[in-house]
């Protein structure tokens, strides 16, 4: 390893622990509503919303808002870019762990 080089260059959007948890859930579940993510992550509504917004801005998450009767529903899923980014992240982490 050269001086001044980071040990591991990974996608910082995904690497943040709360977003990593969200992306992992969406990768395995394909789609999840906001309340499911809220319960599974243990985040507050505001934190979950903020992290989903960052993932959406990066093009990793698709957020669909609709109504079921009069009840609002927010459905989240990974985009193909999000799936690819998560798979790349996993590969990088696995390769790094094999080196240590």
Segments from the language model and where they lie:
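Glycine-centered, phosphate/nucleic-acid-interacting loop/turn motifs that mediate DNA/RNA or nucleotide
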Residues: 59
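N-terminal helix-turn-helix DNA-binding core of bacterial DNA-binding proteins
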Residues: 6-47, 66-77
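Short beta-strand "wing" residues that participate in macromolecule-binding interfaces
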Residues: 63
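Amphipathic alpha-helical dimerization/coiled-coil segments
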Residues: 2-7, 24-25, 83-100
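Residues within the DNA-recognition helix of helix-turn-helix
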Residues: 51
